[in-house]
Amino acid sequence: MARYIGPTCKLSRREGTDLFLKSGARALDSKCKIETAPGQHGQRRGRLSDYGVQLREKQKVRRIYGVLEKQFRGYYKEAARRKGATGENLLKLLESRLDNVVYRMGFGATRSESRQLVSHKAISVNGKTVNVASFQVAAGDVVAVREKAKNQLRIQSALNLAGQRSNVEWVDVNTEKKEGVFKRVPDRVDLPADINENLIVELYSK
């Protein structure tokens, strides 16, 4: 299954909520009417079955983190093997992805841009270049923009945008050095309340 490269607004409209796929340079405006489904006239949102609700929640989370279906299912299986609540474990695995940590630290304006930085070898972890977006960052790891990429305008622009939103508590960023420490894996209370991971567990448990 290929990665989606079409309009990000369309995905937010499909899920009926802002998936934060845009940079935040401008808010989702009247041109992106997330209250109506995609289509020239906006498809009517019918009443969903229990399965439909579970599927939509899975698609929403998958699209927020930019993960393809096969990989997402792999994360679920790993989450189920670990001790604790499967849904919470799933979110922790997604939050620990390198591309997501780069985004949380503000080096990329979106997770998609952060994924590009990783794949273009602009990011290091503990001093070593890592170009795998799914790399699992551990507590205490130092994530930094490599010297060759520090002058990229898009990185400085992303940091400026990040300064306009509230900082997350589980990363500590030095904007001058363009590096940060992943202090800990976030707890469930740290993450968005509008994600219902239990619906995903119910979907995959069938």
UniProtKB/Swiss-Prot annotation:
Residues in a coiled coil are: none
**Record-linked Pfam families:** Ribosomal_S4 (PF00163), S4 (PF01479)
| Family matches, as InterPro entries | Ribosomal_uS4, Ribosomal_uS4_bac-type, Ribosomal_uS4_CS, Ribosomal_uS4_N, S4_RNA-bd, S4_RNA-bd_sf
User: Which biological process terms from the Gene Ontology are attached to this UniProt entry?
Assistant: ribosomal small subunit biogenesis; translation
- Cite the entry's keywords alphabetically: Ribonucleoprotein, Ribosomal protein, RNA-binding, rRNA-binding
Single GO MF annotation: structural constituent of ribosome
**Where is the S4 RNA-binding domain positioned along the sequence?**
96-158
Q: Does the keyword GTP-binding apply?
A: no
Q: Which GO terms describe its cellular component?
A: small ribosomal subunit
Functional note? One of the primary rRNA binding proteins, it binds directly to 16S rRNA where it nucleates assembly of the body of the 30S subunit.
Which PANTHER family does the entry mention?
A: 30S 40S RIBOSOMAL PROTEIN (PTHR11831), SMALL RIBOSOMAL SUBUNIT PROTEIN US4M (PTHR11831:SF4)
Q: Would you identify the family this protein belongs to, as annotated?
A: Belongs to the universal ribosomal protein uS4 family.
The protein's assembly and partners: Part of the 30S ribosomal subunit. Contacts protein S5. The interaction surface between S4 and S5 is involved in control of translational fidelity.
What's the protein here called? Small ribosomal subunit protein uS4
